[in-house]
């Protein structure tokens, strides 16, 4: 889910080590637009989440730093034919969930899932994330008594639902990042 197409996956192989080398993780990469349209390479990234709960957020300086590092590699390797625009951003508060670990990290928060096949007569689900069991995502669906287990491989799109609780977590994450940035600046 971090990349949709074969071209996205090749770009991830090229750019993941670059992002990691400068201290970030790529959450999602999409090369969008066709031959006639201006193509756009969209990279969503974040700082790795640390044991103490800090990280996971990116500010404008982080986006610029990653953009410069990625641009150097893209210019040298030239993996994209034609012109394109590079966009680097944070995933935002109501972020996409693209890695199995995301479903564990955001346990207790509401999410929407879309599957590549029917499960119990539908492809779309909304509920509260209940963690991960092996390679399956656990989700508590409204009106259901038992926790549903969905194979991660079946999920084509997943996103957190914007709630007051999620907004509060986002504010706490930003505050922790700002405090960490201030401590590093004063050292």
Curated annotation (Swiss-Prot):
Endpoints of the signal sequence: none
Q: Where in the cell is it found?
A: Cytoplasm
Q: Return the PANTHER family for the record.
A: RIBOSOME MATURATION FACTOR RIMP
Function description: Required for maturation of 30S ribosomal subunits.
Family membership, please give it.
Answer: Belongs to the RimP family.
InterPro entries in the record: Ribosome_maturation_RimP, RimP_C, RimP_C_sf, RimP_N, RimP_N_sf
- Highest taxon in the source lineage: Bacteria
BP-aspect Gene Ontology terms: ribosomal small subunit assembly; translation
Q: Where does it sit, as one GO cellular component term?
A: cytosol
Question: Which NCBIfam families does this chain map to?
Answer: PRK00092.2-5
Q: Which UniProt keywords apply?
A: Cytoplasm, Ribosome biogenesis
Q: What protein name is recorded for this chain? A: Ribosome maturation factor RimP
Tell me which Pfam families the record gives: DUF150_C, RimP_N
């Amino acid at each position: 889910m971090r990349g949709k197409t074969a071209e996205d996956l090749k770009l991830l192989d090229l750019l993941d080590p670059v992002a990691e080398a400068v201290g970030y993780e790529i959450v999602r990469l999409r090369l969008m637009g066709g031959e006639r349209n201006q193509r756009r390479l969209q990279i969503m990234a974040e700082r790795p989440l640390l044991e103490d709960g800090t990280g996971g957020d990116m500010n404008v300086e982080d986006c610029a730093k990653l953009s410069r590092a990625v641009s150097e590699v893209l210019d040298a390797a030239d993996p994209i034919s034609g012109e394109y625009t590079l966009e680097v951003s944070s995933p935002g508060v109501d972020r996409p969930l693209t890695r199995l670990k995301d479903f564990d990290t955001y346990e207790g928060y509401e999410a929407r899932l879309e599957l590549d096949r029917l499960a119990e007569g539908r492809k779309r689900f909304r509920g509260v994330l209940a963690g991960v069991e092996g390679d399956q995502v656990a989700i508590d669906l409204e009106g259901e008594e038992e926790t549903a287990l969905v194979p991660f491989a079946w999920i084509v799109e997943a996103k957190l639902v914007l709630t007051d609780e999620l907004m509060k977590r986002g504010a706490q994450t930003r505050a922790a990042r700002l405090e960490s940035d201030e401590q590093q600046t004063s050292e």
